[in-house]
C-alpha cells in the first residue's frame, strides 16, 4: 500500500512540475491573417493560426472561435479523444464583405486558458 501511495505522489509531482514549466504550461494563442481592405461584395479568406505547446490528452487546446462583428462565424472544438493536429495549426474561413468588419478570434487551453482575444479590422475599398 505504501508503494502505491508513493507512486501516486511521485506521479502527481511530475505532472505538476510539467505543467509549471513554461515549455509545458502554455496558453492557447491565435493570429488572424486577412487583407486590410476588400471591395464590397468580395469574398475574402481569413486564416486563423493557432499555437499551443504540448497538445496531448491531458493538456490541449479545447476550442477556437472566429467572430465577425461579434457574431460567431466559425468554431472548432477539441477533446482528449480529438486533439488538434499539431502544436501549430491553421483554419481558413471565407467571408463575403458587405461593409467594414471587425474580426476577432480566441483559443483556449483546457488547463491554462487563453492568451486573449485577437482583433483585425477589414475596411471596404
Language model features by range: what are they?
Residues 23-44:
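N-terminal edge beta-strand
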Residues 45-53, 92:
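Short edge beta-strand/loop segments characteristic of extracellular beta-sandwich folds
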Residues 54-59:
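A short beta-turn/strand-edge loop motif at beta-sheet boundaries
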Residues 62-67:
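Beta-strand signatures of extracellular beta-sandwich domains
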Residues 83-92:
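Aromatic sugar-binding surface patches on proteins
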Residues 107-118:
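Short acidic/polar inter-strand loop motif in beta-rich domains
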